[in-house]
UniProtKB/Swiss-Prot annotation:
Zn(2+) 1 binds at residues 75, 78, 95, 99. The gene is tdrd1. This is Tudor domain-containing protein 1. GO terms for molecular function: zinc ion binding. A zinc finger (MYND-type) spans 75-111. PANTHER family: FI02030P-RELATED, TUDOR DOMAIN CONTAINING PROTEIN. It comes from Oryzias latipes (Japanese rice fish). Zn(2+) 2 binds at residues 86, 89, 107, 111.
Length: 1133
């Protein structure tokens, strides 16, 4: 028979819902033998043996403390019970200051000891005043640790009475001791003095605090321990420490304990029976009822065996009136068995075999001729593999080392199982001869929802009561025998859905888990979906890491508990002790020989052959990654992915990454494992390059695994290339050039020919759609021909690579740690674009939904062809933004300028800018370039300012992955717009943007194309038409230069119009949308304007500075005639 698992007896949960048991609630702790049950709340159904309240003692108690009947005082104004008195005469009662204020007109004539200053001040007092609030915040709180400890010694015999009984494992005993009686009366009298007013803001206690609490039965004040506080902070569960009973109390009836009150120890001693533990994890109802009758209303003598929990919990044995000790009685009646620990020591853990033996005795008493259900053995557990990661919900929680989860993906399976169980049990009648043996599986009816679930019989607490564990949810309860039904073989086919887990990497700070740790972890994982990753197995449970959130917002629960000092890092040797002990018994073997790691890259033919390539990662024409063929080795990569998963799931060893060495990396996007090369170590994270695809990524060290030589046999599929024969038209590749190049090569089959080879990759000539990519870049004026194109014959990348092709794989290159450079390793060259921060114009803007109409919030304007709006829909992920800000600050503080790289930015490029107010670095977009200062708009907030050139730095590509709050836009109809914009037209465009409505027409690959409509009060016209009219008027007065005009001409320069305050903080985007009046001329055209020049040339076919479209002339002529007609009509009128 399988080993019997005895979890705490709590009710099961419905499928995929919150646990039925909670920390800090009665059912959370099976109080019998656990020392940490002190002051954790009374069990449901507990009753006081003396009285229902702390201050009303039963007359049957023999020590003679009888509380006099309280005198009721009623408010002189409203008639309600009141505890305040007039400060003048000290006689007239009131319930509040408000009632005293209202009654003062009548009462002042009879108030003999009237003091005008005293009463006047009293009338002005209000609980809502700032002084009262400040005093309540500065109150000195008192906790249990501040009270004196009980001074009874071990072996002492104490006479008294049990005043509150929950179970033999938890009851409260009040000693018949004159000192205790004196302390109790002193505490009660002190608590009734000058209680705080109930009007105004109530005092909010904290969990674990000892307060003065007004008892609901007699409305007197007593010392109470705050055990739990409701989420809305309106009620608290309170344990009256001097009497042992508990209740839920509104916070209005709780006030801080007077610090002048003497710190007496709790008068009621919390006790548990010594030397015995229950048959199962909690005491049966029958046992509690029997013992309660033996203890209630009697004077008893207890013997103190031990003191636990910092002197708060006492292990005792009681001499019963029947002449037996309580422990002896419990053993004889079969309610408990003897504890294995020696007398005087802490209770030991229960032996499952002893539990099973005691249970079997109850089972065998009436099993003759019964159906004991021996065939129904528990189903197999779910198959789990190390490295698996999946979403779960927590169905039952006890502590970080004992909780149950269910897979979210199995929710439908569980629901279907419940329907089948309901149908099965509704057709099966109660069978009197059904008595399933412990360890077998049957159907059990859950007491809360009366539904049927699969359950394993754990034990027989009595002849007719059975403890069952719900195998699909993890929790358990005690049920009557007639609430069980036989199960069918079909219902046992599904594996157990409950997964028993232990949080990996943590251990208690002390001997057991603290309540703060348990409640904190439960708040993090209860009622939500979390991700778990299987790391190992320990004692039949899964060691898991719990990850909350996704991507950059991931939170490791274990790390959070450690950082909050709720847990300590686990000693890895502890969990491996069993395995090491077993291994030590075997004869020592020689250490395995580590096979060196060798790898290679796919090579491109260097003899002038033409090959088909497809891009996998594109940064710029100077750096992109390709794979040979559109689907090269696709099937091989799929098979490799399976092998990588199997390897990483079975490899649980700690991996130390080294720069220049390959490894396995889990990609957060799909959770799959890929081959990668370690590029850079950044503390707790690592920058890697996916060698089969070319992408760079920063991942945590927990996402890395070692790699084997077998997994490196397939050459790395991504080949690093650059476009040969061209170089940027300016100092760097413009944003338009980057976007144009990406759109041309992404997803296309490219014909490539290698013209040069280096350690950094291949220089290639590309053809896309029958045209040369380099020639197209030059014709679009995005690039210019390179003057240093190599004319030498094509050579192979390295001599060592030739050896690789001709020799055996065993002669391949070893990792960089062995002083040998890998063939395809990029190295850490400062010229590598992916490693060097740049003023990149290739940042991708968010796409707005098509045909959506909204009122735009303008962030910055360069011209009608290029302006920036705040995203109308997108919500900024503040956590991810903070992570980017931290990394940005680290980058800027460590940035070192390189003289070999021309870092002069261009308008529209992304950068790092230091805000002038708080001196913090932010992501920004350059609007205007000057010699001493630049105009920027802060990309995550929308405000803009001019900053010195020294406060502008290039930005790494990885910091551009999080989308900006601002979006790049262009006005619809831009194909008819000029290259250079007159300042007057730009000023009109800026002024007309107020209160316009925008409609998204398309996305042209780099910007959102918007149609802007003026408000009805301004005519409701399309803003593009207004701009066209203004351009026409300007052309007639001052013709625009054509595209062939030289850069040195005196043409009107483009203007950069900025909308936004120059002093608003990036943290306050709402205040950053005030338009500025300054219009500053730049000294050179932007790349965007150069592209518009080419477009305008192709559309209009300009032949001279005064030429324009014939259709536009006709439209303007008709407009002039209409204006003349209107003027003539007005003149006649």
């Amino acid at each position: 028979m399988n080993e019997l698992r005895m979890p705490n007896l709590v009710r099961p949960n419905r499928p995929l819902r919150e646990p039925a048991s909670r920390p800090l609630t009665p059912s959370r702790f099976p109080v019998p033998s656990q020392p940490d049950a002190a002051y954790t709340g009374s069990a449901a159904g507990s009753t006081g043996l003396g009285s229902p309240g702390p201050a009303i003692m039963d007359g049957s108690t023999s020590f003679g403390l009888v509380q006099p009947a309280p005198t009721a005082h009623f408010c002189h104004y409203c008639g309600q019970q009141g505890i305040f008195r007039c400060k003048g005469c000290k006689k007239t009662p009131y319930c509040s200051v408000d009632c005293q204020r209202e009654d003062w007109k009548a009462h002042r004539h009879m108030c003999k000891s009237f003091d005008p200053e005293t009463v006047g001040e009293n009338m002005k007092e209000s609980p809502d005043s700032d002084n009262v609030r400040e005093d309540s915040l500065n109150i000195q709180r008192i906790y249990l640790k501040d009270l004196n400890a009980t001074k009874y010694t071990k072996g002492a015999e104490i006479q008294g009475a049990v005043v509150e009984f929950n179970s033999p494992g938890r009851f409260f005993f009040l000693p018949e001791d004159p000192k205790v009686m004196e302390a109790l009366m002193s505490i009660t009298a002190e608590x009734q003095k000058x209680p705080s007013s109930t009007v105004g803001t109530p005092y909010v206690p904290c969990v674990g605090e000892v307060c003065s609490v007004q008892f609901s039965x007699d409305l007197n004040w007593y010392r109470g321990l705050i055990q739990t506080l409701a989420a809305d902070q309106k009620t608290a569960h309170v344990l009256y420490i001097d009497y042992g009973n508990a209740e839920n109390v509104p916070v209005e009836r709780i006030k801080p304990l007077n610090i002048a009150t003497k710190p007496y120890c709790p008068c009621a001693m919390e006790c548990q029976x010594a030397g015995v533990v229950p048959i199962v994890d909690s005491w049966s109802t029958e046992c509690c009822m029997t013992v309660r009758q033996l203890l209630g209303g009697k004077t008893l003598t207890i013997k103190l065996v031990d003191t636990l929990k910092n002197g708060r919990v006492h292990t005792v044995d009681i001499q019963l009136s029947i002449g037996k000790q309580l422990s002896t009685f419990l053993l004889e009646q079969g309610y408990a068995f003897a504890e294995a620990a020696a007398v005087g020591s802490a209770p030991a853990k229960k032996d499952p075999s002893a539990l099973l033996e005691a249970s079997m005795e109850n089972f065998k008493r009436c099993c003759e001729g019964k159906d004991i259900n021996e065939w129904a053995q528990p189903p197999e557990p779910l198959t789990l593999t190390i490295g698996d990661r999946f979403s779960v919900v927590v169905s039952h929680f006890q502590s970080p080392t004992d909780f149950i989860v269910q897979k979210v993906e199995n929710a439908g399976v569980i629901q279907d199982l419940q329907l089948k169980l309901r149908e099965h049990c509704s057709g099966v009648e109660t069978q009197q001869d059904f008595r399933p043996a412990p360890g077998t599986v049957c159907c059990a009816q859950f007491s809360e929802d009366k539904q049927w679930y699969r359950a394993q019989v754990l034990a027989y607490s009595t002849e007719k009561s059975v403890c069952v564990g719900y195998i699909d949810f993890g929790n358990s309860e005690e049920v009557d025998l007639n609430h069980l039904r036989p199960i069918s073989p079909a219902l046992l086919a599904l594996p157990k859905q409950a997964i028993s887990c232990i949080l990996a990497g943590v251990q208690p700070v002390e001997d057991s888990w603290s309540e703060e740790c348990i409640s904190t972890m439960l708040r993090m994982i209860a009622n939500k979906t979390v991700n778990v990753e299987i790391q190992s197995a320990h004692k039949g449970k899964a060691l898991v890491a719990i990850i909350e959130g996704e991507g950059y917002s991931e939170i490791n629960v274990a790390e959070l508990l450690i950082s909050a000092n709720y847990a300590a890092p686990a000693d890895s040797n502890t969990l491996q002790q069993t395995e090491e002990t077993t291994a030590s018994a075997e004869p020592p073997a020689s250490p395995p020989v580590c096979e060196p790691l060798v790898w290679s890259c796919v090579e491109l033919p260097s003899d002038g052959q033409t090959v088909v390539l497809s891009t996998s990662a594109v940064t710029s024409p100077a750096e992109f990654y390709c794979c040979v063929g559109p689907t090269t080795d696709h099937q091989v990569l799929m098979e490799l992915g399976v092998q990588l998963k199997q390897h990483c799931q079975s490899d649980s060893t700690y991996f130390v990454p080294k720069v220049g060495e390959p490894c396995c990396v889990k990609f957060s996007g799909d959770g799959k494992w890929y081959r990668a090369m370690v590029k850079e170590l950044l503390g707790d994270v690592v920058k890697v390059n996916f060698v089969d695809f070319g992408h760079n990524m920063i991942v945590g060290k927990g996402c890395l695994r070692s790699i084997t030589p077998k997994l490196l046999k397939l050459p790395f599929q991504a080949v690093r290339c650059w476009l040969a024969g061209v170089k940027p038209a300016g100092s760097e590749w413009s944003s338009e050039a980057l976007l144009w190049f990406q759109n041309l090569v992404d997803g296309a089959q490219l014909l490539a020919r290698v013209v040069s080879v280096s350690q950094q990759g291949y220089g290639v000539e590309l053809e896309s759609g029958g045209q040369s990519v380099a020639a197209a870049l030059v014709s679009q004026q995005f690039a210019k021909p390179s003057g240093n194109l190599s004319k030498d014959p094509v050579r192979s990348p390295t001599t060592k690579q030739e050896d690789l092709r001709g020799g055996d794989q065993s002669q391949a290159l070893t990792p960089a740690s062995n002083d040998t450079q890998a063939v395809c390793e990029d190295g850490k060259s400062e010229e590598e674009p992916s490693e060097v921060a740049t003023f990149s114009s290739a940042w991708k803007t968010a796409e707005l939904p098509l045909n959506e109409t909204f009122q735009p919030c303008v962030a910055a304007v360069i011209n009608p062809t290029l302006f920036y709006l705040l995203h109308p829909i997108q919500n900024v992920d503040q956590q991810k933004l903070q992570e980017v800000m931290l990394e940005l600050a680290l980058h800027c503080s460590n940035y070192q300028s390189s003289s070999s790289v021309d870092t002069r930015p261009v308008p529209g490029a992304a950068c790092c800018a230091q805000f002038s107010v708080d001196k913090i670095w932010y992501r920004a977009i350059i609007l205007e370039v000057g010699e001493a200062e630049m105009s920027v708009v802060y990309a995550d907030y929308g405000n803009s300012e001019k900053v010195p050139v020294s406060q502008i730095l290039p930005i790494p590509t990885r910091l551009l992955q999080l989308p900006f709050k601002i979006i790049r836009c262009t006005l619809a109809g831009n194909e008819h717009f000029p290259v250079e914009w007159p300042p007057q037209v730009q000023q009109v465009f800026r002024s007309e943007l107020l209160n316009v409505m925008a409609t998204v027409q398309s996305f042209d690959g780099s910007a959102n194309v918007l149609s802007l409509a003026l408000p009805p009060e301004r005519g409701g016209r399309n803003l593009a038409a207004v701009i066209q009219e203004m351009l026409h008027v300007h052309r007639k007065g001052s013709p625009l230069p054509d595209a062939s005009q030289t850069p040195g001409s005196d043409a009107t320069e483009p203007s950069c119009i900025k909308l936004g305050s120059t002093t608003a903080s990036p943290d306050e985007p709402e205040d950053a949308a005030e338009p500025a009046d300054a219009v500053t001329n730049t000294q050179e055209s932007t790349p965007q304007e150069q592209k518009e020049m080419d477009q305008a040339t192709s559309v209009h076919d300009l032949q001279g500075p005064g030429c324009c479209c014939q259709s536009l002339k006709k439209q303007m002529d008709r407009l002039e005639k209409m204006v003349q007609l209107l003027l003539s009509l007005q003149a006649e009128g």
